[in-house]
Regions:
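An N-terminal assembly and electron-transfer interface module characteristic of large anaerobic redox
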Residues: 1-446
């Protein structure tokens, strides 16, 4: 099967992770643009270079696209770039000319512009550092009250006008994609929404798109992986098992639906089918939270897993979402008392609940339907998740105040030995901070 993939940007979870997952099946021929063509925290993607890459692809079975990358230069540039609606429209019309020539199924997604409830502008326009929370409040109250919030008198007019204009531009571009969908260009088109609250312009826009026939999904970075999973032929039957069944109606951080609905939605988007335990191909254990989702980096604690966990004698995978962005140490310690044999189909505790679930299900589905199963690639995927989600995010990161590869490498050694023992394979890796910040680390195999 030949699949081409245009990521959101060049972060490890967006670029390296899908490549690693695809390698689990030697029967997948995976086409990925050069990393240098993609954007990062400061630079937008080389859009013309990506257009040329798309033109040069051989005949494919499936094409997975981040439309933000091809329209704006990436997810972050979609919120920052100053180009007008007409400029973006002209660009995506050229993209459409390329796509109509592709005789394959196209799986695409575009983001609904987020509204972060903070004054942190690393991924936003400069003015977010001073006015971000006020803009969030303005959006929230205007939607909730059904009329313009009085906060409009606090935010400088030129800033509010720019923000509203950027939102309107992106929304109108999304409406164009929806027309393409109705014309039959896409097999699947998803409008993603992340950093959601109960009210806000992003929530309104999602409802408008749904009313027009669009499909919206909570999440962002994992959606290309869910679409990759959807492109894999076959329907896998999955039974979710919540380790805290009385709390599955609670809502995860950065999301707007319960963890139970999030799990169901991720299974369906990935081309899976919800099943009961007796009929399931794979069991999905969800280490969910009891009262609220913790957040290790933010110092928000929550009740850790306190029971026993014995792996089943059948295929299973584990979404560890008790904390946002990092493992539940108690649960991992309990998990590691087991033998992770051929029935183990994956573990993830990557960032948000949606991130964890989407990436986990994708890896499991590729393994389940693999025509040429590559065990080494699967083990590399699990090494990456345990070292990133457990060793780094839940432990070593807390000892660092700034990116320091030497300190990171030294701190990871004891965890590497544990992972070697549990996965019964050598761990020979090196680390880097590709975006020069603590938030993400790259695990590279030597």
């Amino acid at each position: 099967m030949k699949i081409a993939f245009v990521p959101i940007d060049n972060r490890p979870v967006c670029y390296t992770l899908p490549k690693l997952i695809s390698q689990i099946d030697g029967g997948i021929e995976f086409f990925l643009p050069e990393r240098s063509l993609l954007g990062d925290l400061e630079n937008i993607a080389n859009i013309q270079g990506l257009f040329d890459w798309l033109k040069g692809l051989p005949k494919l079975d499936a094409l997975v696209l981040s439309l933000d990358t091809l329209a704006y230069g990436g997810l972050i540039p979609s919120r920052r770039c100053p180009e007008t609606f007409d400029e973006i429209k002209s660009r995506i019309e050229k993209l459409k000319e390329i796509l109509v020539e592709k005789e394959c199924k196209i799986y695409a997604f575009s983001s609904i512009m987020r509204i972060s409830n903070n004054n942190y502008n690393q991924e936003e326009k400069e003015y977010w550092s001073k006015w971000g929370k006020k803009i969030f409040d303005y959006s929230f109250q205007t939607h909730k009250l059904g009329c313009e919030s009085c906060i409009t008198n606090i935010i400088p007019a030129e800033i509010l006008d720019d923000y509203i204009a950027t939102r309107k531009r992106n929304f109108e571009i999304n409406k164009i994609y929806l027309e393409w969908q109705k014309e039959g260009l896409f097999d699947t088109l998803i409008f993603s929404k992340d950093d959601c609250a109960e009210y806000g312009f992003n929530v309104q826009e999602a409802k408008f798109l749904e009313d027009l026939g669009g499909f919206t999904k909570t999440g962002a970075d994992e959606i290309p992986l869910s679409l990759l999973s959807r492109a894999i032929c076959g329907e896998v039957k999955i039974c979710p098992i919540f380790l805290e069944p009385n709390s599955k109606d609670l809502i995860s951080n950065y999301e707007d639906v319960s963890i139970e609905k999030s799990v169901q939605g991720q299974i369906e988007l990935a081309g899976g089918k919800l099943s009961d335990e007796n009929d399931a191909d794979i069991l999905l254990y969800v280490n969910n939270f009891v009262d609220h989702q913790g957040e290790i980096v933010m110092g928000v604690n929550t009740e850790s897993f306190g029971g026993k966990f014995i792996v089943p004698n059948r295929p299973y995978m584990i979404a560890d979402v008790r904390f946002a962005n990092g493992s539940d140490n108690n649960f991992v310690n309990e998990l590691f008392k087991n033998n992770l044999d051929e029935n183990f189909y994956g573990y993830s505790a990557w960032n948000t609940s949606a991130n964890s679930l989407g990436s986990l299900i994708c890896g499991a589905k590729v393994k389940y339907f693999a025509k040429k199963y590559n065990q080494d690639a699967f083990k590399k995927l699990q090494i990456t998740r345990f070292l990133d989600d457990w060793a780094y995010q839940a432990n070593v990161r807390q000892t660092l105040s700034e990116p320091d590869v030497d300190k990171l490498t030294a701190g990871m050694k004891e965890f590497e030995k544990v992972v070697e023992n549990i996965l019964k394979t050598e761990v020979n890796v090196k680390y880097s901070y590709p975006w020069k910040r603590l938030f993400e680390v790259e695990v590279e195999f030597n």
